[in-house]
Amino acid sequence: DQKFSNKFYETMIKNKRVDIHTRLFRLDFLKITGFAVLLLGAIVLSYIYLLPPLAEKSVEILPETVDDEIGNLFLDQYIKEQDVDKIRTLKLQEFANGLKLNNSKPLNFTVINSNEVNAFALPNGHIVVHSAILKGMKTPDELVALLGHEAAHVNHRHSIKMLSRNLAGYFLVSLLFSDVNGAIAILAENAQQIHALSYSRKFEEEADSEGLKILVANKFDPNGIVRLFEQLESNESKYIPQILSSHPLTAKRKQS
């Protein structure tokens, strides 16, 4: 009858409206979820690929006294725990003083007795050399190549730049609010990470290039840097030298 037909029609219209609302809700939910996923992805990608280079670039606004402060904080604690070879330290310092290392600040050298094949530069201009890497050298050219390489890390502030990259989020937030002292404090709190930093390929190639120029400028055999690489590789056949964890040796570096 007419009454039943009208009621049936009203029910159909109502259900259709409910169905439309449900579809719209689902569509909005999918849009919101998709946007949230895209936003999260953008944040993650920015943190990985955008913030570290920005943090590295921001180091330029920090005075080099920051490098000295961070280096001193690490060195004061580190040296207490090491067996310093005072005689070799004096000889190495004397040898280095006679070289043109293009250094932007005074360079100080310390030799420590260690079976680990390693050498590393601190941002304050202090270069630590392990006795094991010295024992493996056959010519002065290799030593000049090593010192030139490490001096380049100091000159280009590589360790401070890498530390800033590793702490990019905290570091940039401080600088964003013009809190330079806060940024410096963050670096200082993490000064002990300096020893464990792994330089980027770009920094290593930059240091290799400058090390080669230093060899030539001081009238040493440029092949000294090749022999240095060969020594590191020969040690790698016995065990992975500590220096390779912070100075990755690549085929491209050897070829260049």
Give residue ranges: language-model regions.
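A Zn2+-metalloprotease active-site environment signal
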Residues: 3-256
